[in-house]
């Protein structure tokens, strides 16, 4: 359910564990083009990290003491395929959930968390054989070239052409690609043997911004 249900529970004097659908339901899709529910929100790792389990403005000091923790939920309707989708939906969103559970609001910093996650913790997940969702690259097409921005330092980004999905055997992206057929390219981040991001296509820059008020 939503954040307000947890707040209402606390205001009625109940000990409460916060589990709002729009932040901690891991059966929600992680982007517009990925498998999963959408009724609560599109929930990526950054959105999980943004959630503050103990609302400062809505509750008194004594009421906040009734919040005993935060929890993630993963319902199974979409977990039948592809293979190991439960791991993909869980990690690294669980890492973000864990950090907000034990961190004070003033200590939270997305850039710091993301750096620690991509520099060390993803490697731990890979060594454990977890098929986590890696962070996708961004690809832009301009002046006859596709330029890819990797999601973090030394990320392994591979690409495929003609509508096929990139695999671990696909060419490694190392420099801008000259082409007229940018719409045929897909790019994906890989980590270890099991983890990968969703694939992305190159986008052209907007020609102009339209303002209907003028």
Ranges and model annotations:
Residues 1-145:
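Flexible, acidic glycine-rich loops studded with aromatic residues
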Residues 104, 108-214:
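Short, compositionally stereotyped local motifs that mark structural "simplifiers"
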């Amino acid at each position: 359910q939503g954040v307000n249900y947890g707040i209402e529970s606390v205001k009625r004097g109940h000990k409460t564990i916060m589990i709002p659908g729009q932040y901690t339901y891991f059966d929600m899709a992680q982007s517009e083009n990925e498998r999963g529910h959408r009724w609560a929100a599109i929930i990526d790792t950054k959105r999980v990290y943004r959630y503050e389990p103990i609302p400062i403005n809505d509750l008194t000091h004594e009421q906040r003491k009734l919040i005993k923790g935060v929890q993630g939920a993963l319902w199974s309707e979409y977990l039948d395929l592809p293979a190991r989708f439960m791991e993909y939906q869980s990690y690294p969103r669980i890492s973000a959930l864990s950090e907000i559970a034990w961190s004070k609001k003033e200590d939270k910093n997305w850039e710091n968390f993301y750096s620690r996650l991509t520099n060390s913790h993803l490697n731990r997940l890979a060594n454990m054989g977890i098929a986590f969702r890696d962070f996708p690259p961004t690809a832009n097409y301009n002046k006859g070239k596709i330029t890819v921005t990797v999601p973090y330092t030394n990320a392994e980004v591979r690409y495929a052409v003609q509508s096929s999905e990139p695999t671990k055997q696909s060419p490694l992206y190392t420099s801008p690609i000259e082409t007229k057929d940018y719409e045929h390219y897909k790019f994906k981040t890989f980590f270890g043997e099991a983890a990968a991001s969703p694939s992305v296509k190159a986008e052209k820059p907007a020609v102009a911004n339209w303002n209907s008020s003028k």
